[in-house]
């Protein structure tokens, strides 16, 4: 899990898993994970009353989106009528038919930081082309290419990480990605945008 990975790389820090607005407002950084479908995650976020707290936190606090958490940062998704958080311009697209490749894209794949993002603090100590673990049928398409922090090839070249100011997000799961994933979490804990 994300919390276990963070506890492993930052044993002196307190890691809290919470669905309380107060915890989000008091934290010094935030991880937005997600599981399932973006419309369901957005619906649960709105129903929980956390949406406003999350949007306020995203203005200034380091924020790391993971998988659906990355997708939720964008404006909309082909997955359903739900709107995203619109913290980044762009949309979430479904992989088309890519025979003989299977959808969902599941397993290890290489991640290539973009030239403009290669020196981003979250990539520190991670070699370009390192393997990370993916499980997804959708990918983000950023409207602003300067937000693309990495790409991956799976039938097409798709965006596998994005960044802007205090926000960084990955389509892959760092917590399932062995040493490279733990290093990314360690870098996030130290990141001071």
Give the predicted meaning of each segment:
Residues 65, 69:
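Gly/Ala-rich beta-loop-alpha elbow adjacent to hydrolase catalytic centers
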């Amino acid at each position: 899990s994300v919390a276990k990975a963070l506890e492993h790389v930052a044993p002196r820090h307190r890691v809290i898993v919470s669905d309380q607005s107060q915890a989000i407002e008091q934290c010094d950084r935030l991880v937005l994970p997600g599981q399932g479908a973006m419309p369901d995650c957005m619906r649960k976020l709105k129903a929980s009353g956390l949406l406003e707290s999350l949007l306020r936190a995203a203005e200034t606090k380091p924020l790391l989106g993971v998988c659906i958490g990355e997708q939720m940062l964008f404006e909309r998704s082909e997955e359903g009528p739900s709107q995203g958080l619109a913290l980044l311009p762009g949309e979430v697209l479904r992989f088309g038919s890519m025979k003989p490749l299977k959808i969902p894209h599941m397993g290890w794949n290489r991640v290539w930081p973009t030239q403009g993002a290669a020196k981003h603090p979250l990539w520190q100590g991670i070699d370009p082309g390192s393997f990370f673990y993916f499980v997804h049928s959708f990918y983000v398409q950023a409207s602003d290419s300067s937000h693309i922090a990495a790409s991956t090839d799976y039938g097409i070249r798709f965006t596998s990480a994005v960044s802007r100011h205090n926000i960084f997000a990955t389509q892959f799961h760092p917590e399932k990605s062995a040493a490279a994933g733990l290093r990314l979490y360690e870098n996030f804990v130290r990141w001071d945008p």
